[in-house]
Structures are given as structure tokens and as C-alpha cells.
Amino acid sequence: MDYEASRIVEMVEDEEHIDLPPGFRFHPTDEELITHYLKPKVFNTFFSATAIGEVDLNKIEPWDLPWKAKMGEKEWYFFCVRDRKYPTGLRTNRATEAGYWKATGKDKEIFKGKSLVGMKKTLVFYKGRAPKGVKTNWVMHEYRLEGKYCIENLPQTAKNEWVICRVFQKRADGTKVPMSMLDPHINRMEPAGLPSLMDCSQRDSFTGSSSHVTCFSDQETEDKRLVHESKDGFGSLFYSDPLFLQDNYSLMKLLLDGQETQFSGKPFDGRDSSGTEELDCVWNF
């Protein structure tokens, strides 16, 4: 290992022991990923970083990657070894069990000063198999060494072609989906199993039919009417309850007995002493 590579490894190892205050996030630039993380990994396969995990992307689906990462809320970083389809070829195997990663757009050059040091490739995950794969909103940025750091210019000890992958899920508006919304174990608030509310027409119909209840009725007839109306209106929420019916009938009977005492000996025709106005219903709900 040459002096420059050795020095880079030492610097990065020193950074591993820095205690950062709360609130700091791992948000490196493209050049920082190449210079401070990918190059040391290529020179020393035992190199590790606090914020970057190590996975085989061909064995893990994108929606499982957030829980394989060391840290990250909206994007997750990994060291990966590119899986060549053929030993002497340049094509990379990007298939998983559920689908495949497909490159999109043109690779972006990454510079350190005026020197080309790396390239960034953008890929999108498709479910199924080409050419009938279904596009998802999972995106990956793959960083590789290039220019003076190109694999051809590295020592023979750098046998594996390491890359850094940044994975995230993208919304339609371009924003990234946070991990808290991806976690299948979070208990989201679901609507309770309550009876559906009435619409306006049902409510008006229910109110109209019960706004003036006949004052004199026997228990059997009244119970049947209430149960019938409850099915048309609020279901069995209140009025089909036998205890509720019994209590209200007892109240009505008590009130009516008082009316019978007051008007004993007089035929009751639903009018007051003046004979001009209708009595309000005793049981009006």
C-alpha cells in the first residue's frame, strides 16, 4: 500500500472515533464518498465506516435495505462488490429474486479539484423480469472509482471492484420517503369498526318520522316502531336495545298515568283545556 493510500485510511479511521453532537447527519457530497470512503475500501477490504453498511445487492430487495443500513432516515449507504455477469466482461448482474436494477440516464463525472476521481450511475428498481418489469419508486446511486483512481490504476491487492450505493425511495413530487413511513411494524391509526354514519337524507327522514310521536301507544306497538326506525336510521346503536326501550316505556307510562289522573272523567282528544292546541308529545327524542 502506498503512502497516500495509507494516510487516507488513517485519516478515515481517526474520523471513526469523533464524537459528533446530537443533530448531525451523515450527508456526504459525491466527492467525499469517493475520496474518504470508497477509495480506502478499495485499498483495504477490511476498512469499515460507521455510517456505511455492507451488503450483497443481488440477495436483498430494495424495500429490505433500510433495515440493513447502519444509519439513515431517508437514504441509506452500502459498500457492495459489483457482480460481473462474465469473468472477462464488463456487464454487471443487477438482478434480485423479485426484480432488477436498471440504469437510467447518463453517468455523472465526479471531480476532486480538476481531477476526475469517480462516476455516479443512477438506477431504478423494476419488479419482475425484463422486458416486462414494472417500474418502482426505488432509486439507487452507484459510485465507482474513475480517472486516476480507476481500478486499472490500483495495486493488485485491490482485486474486488467495490462500489458505494446510496438507496432511497422517491415520491412523485421528488421528495424522499422517510424510514418511519416504510416500517411495517409501526401501528398506524386505522378507522375503528363503528357503524357508518347516516347521510343527510337518512337523518332528515329519521328526524321527520320521530319529531312528533303519538302520546298514547301500547308497549308492543311502540317497541316494534322503535326497532323498525332504528334499522332505518342508527342501526342497533341505541333504540333496539331492550333495556333502553323498557326504561323509556316506563317513563312514558308514568307520565301518561299522571295525565290520566289529571283528566280523569274527561274524554281526551289530544287538545288542551281551550280545545284549540295540540299537546306536545310526552316522549319526543
From Swiss-Prot:
Classification via Gene3D superfamilies: NAC domain
Name of the protein: NAC domain-containing protein 92
Effect of deleting the gene: No visible phenotype. Delayed leaf senescence and flowering. Increased tolerance to various types of oxidative stress including H(2)O(2), salicylhydroxamic acid (SHAM), N,N-diethyldithio carbamic acid (DDC) and methyl viologen (MV). Impaired age-related resistance (ARR) against Pseudomonas syringae pv. tomato and Hyaloperonospora arabidopsidis. Increased seed germination rate under saline conditions and delay of salinity-induced chlorophyll loss in leaves.
Alphabetic keyword roster: Activator, Apoptosis, DNA-binding, Nucleus, Transcription, Transcription regulation, Ubl conjugation
Organism name: Arabidopsis thaliana (Mouse-ear cress)
Quaternary structure annotation from Swiss-Prot or TrEMBL: Forms homodimers. Interacts with GLK1 and GLK2. Interacts with NLA.
Residues annotated as domain NAC: 20-170
Tissue-by-tissue expression: Mostly expressed in roots and flowers, and, to a lower extent, in shoots and leaves. Particularly expressed in old and senescing tissues.
DNA-binding feature ranges: 117-176
Record-level GO cellular component terms: nucleus
GO terms classed as biological process: floral organ senescence; lateral root development; leaf senescence; positive regulation of age-related resistance; positive regulation of DNA-binding transcription factor activity; positive regulation of DNA-templated transcription; positive regulation of leaf senescence; positive regulation of programmed cell death
Pfam families assigned to the protein according to its UniProt record, in alphabetical order: NAM (PF02365)
Function text: Transcription activator that binds to DNA in promoters of target genes on a specific bipartite motif 5'-[ACG][CA]GT[AG](5-6n)[CT]AC[AG]-3'. Promotes lateral root development. Triggers the expression of senescence-associated genes during age-, salt- and dark-induced senescence through a regulatory network that may involve cross-talk with salt- and H(2)O(2)-dependent signaling pathways. Also regulates genes during seed germination. Positively regulates aging-induced cell death. Involved in age-related resistance (ARR) against Pseudomonas syringae pv. tomato and Hyaloperonospora arabidopsidis.
InterPro entries in the cross-refs: NAC-dom, NAC_dom_sf
GO molecular function: DNA-binding transcription factor activity; protein homodimerization activity; sequence-specific DNA binding; transcription cis-regulatory region binding
Free-text note on domains in this protein's UniProt record: The NAC domain includes a DNA binding domain and a dimerization domain.
Additional record remark: 'Oresara' means long-living in Korean.
